Swiss-Prot record:
Superkingdom field: Eukaryota
InterPro entries the record matches: bHLH_dom, HLH_DNA-bd_sf, Mesogenin/MesP
Disordered: region residues: 79-101
Annotated protein name in UniProt: Mesogenin-1
Domain bHLH: 95-149
Phylogenetic classification of the source organism: Eukaryota, Metazoa, Chordata, Craniata, Vertebrata
Organism the protein comes from: Gallus gallus
Length: 159
């Protein structure tokens, strides 16, 4: 892989030392030329494809990076425990998805039947010529029709 990428990338790969770690992860310190600050610094921008190739090694004793072994065991997944990446949804089984789809179809069919019944009870003055009312129009016209019937009943009671 190093040979196909060219000499400029070989510096990056050699700083990782990915070929020489044949065994388990070992605790070792890695000198870091970068700041651990969340704000970007001027030095972090480089025209080089690899920051390690553009900068000189860090000789200060302040910031040191460590390998994977440094993390407490509570933060690492146990061997028998598989973790999904954050944001990944658990997939429903095909049977469960099919049942949910059938329930949703039945719910929509029941709603459509109820709206059709409401449309049949509305007088023709509320319907649009030749076109069935939409769901919202049906509900609004039904509310208006009920309020008109209520006013009519109240006026009869007063007389």
């Amino acid at each position: 892989m190093e040979d196909t990428l060219g000499s400029e990338h070989s510096v990056c790969l050699s700083s990782w030392d990915w070929k020489n770690t044949a065994g388990a992860f070992e605790l070792h310190s890695v000198s870091s030329p970068h700041s651990l600050s969340p704000t970007p610094s001027f030095e972090s921008y480089s025209s080089s494809p690899c920051p390690a190739a553009a900068e000189t090694p860090y000789s200060g004793g302040g910031l040191v990076g460590y390998g994977l072994v440094d993390f407490p065991p509570a933060y690492l997944p146990s061997p028998g425990q598989a973790r999904l990446p954050k944001g990944t949804k658990v997939r429903m089984s095909a049977q469960r998805r099919r049942k949910a789809s059938e329930r949703e179809k039945l719910r929509m069919r029941t709603l459509a039947d109820a709206l059709h019944t409401l449309r049949n009870y509305l007088p023709p003055a509320y319907s649009q010529r030749g076109q069935p009312l939409t769901k919202i129009q049906t509900l609004k016209c039904t509310i208006k029709y009920i309020s008109e019937l209520t006013e009519l009943l109240n006026s009869v009671k007063r007389a």
